[in-house]
């Protein structure tokens, strides 16, 4: 998934 600003916040990215 695309992170909301974090990198490993939701296991997503920093997009």
Curated annotation (Swiss-Prot):
It is found in: Secreted. GO terms for biological process: adaptive immune response; blood coagulation; innate immune response. A long coiled coil structure formed by 3 polypeptide chains connects the central nodule to the C-terminal domains (distal nodules). The long C-terminal ends of the alpha chains fold back, contributing a fourth strand to the coiled coil structure. GO terms for cellular component: extracellular region. Cleaved by the protease thrombin to yield monomers which, together with fibrinogen beta (FGB) and fibrinogen gamma (FGG), polymerize to form an insoluble fibrin matrix. Fibrin has a major function in hemostasis as one of the primary components of blood clots. In addition, functions during the early stages of wound repair to stabilize the lesion and guide cell migration during re-epithelialization. Was originally thought to be essential for platelet aggregation, based on in vitro studies using anticoagulated blood. Its main location: secreted. Heterohexamer; disulfide linked. Contains 2 sets of 3 non-identical chains (alpha, beta and gamma). The 2 heterotrimers are in head to head conformation with the N-termini in a small central domain. This is Fibrinogen alpha chain. Conversion of fibrinogen to fibrin is triggered by thrombin, which cleaves fibrinopeptides A and B from alpha and beta chains, and thus exposes the N-terminal polymerization sites responsible for the formation of the soft clot. The soft clot is converted into the hard clot by factor XIIIA which catalyzes the epsilon-(gamma-glutamyl)lysine cross-linking between gamma chains (stronger) and between alpha chains (weaker) of different monomers. Keywords: Adaptive immunity, Blood coagulation, Coiled coil, Disulfide bond, Hemostasis, Immunity, Innate immunity, Secreted.
């Amino acid at each position: 998934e695309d992170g909301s600003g974090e990198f490993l916040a939701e296991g997503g990215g920093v997009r």
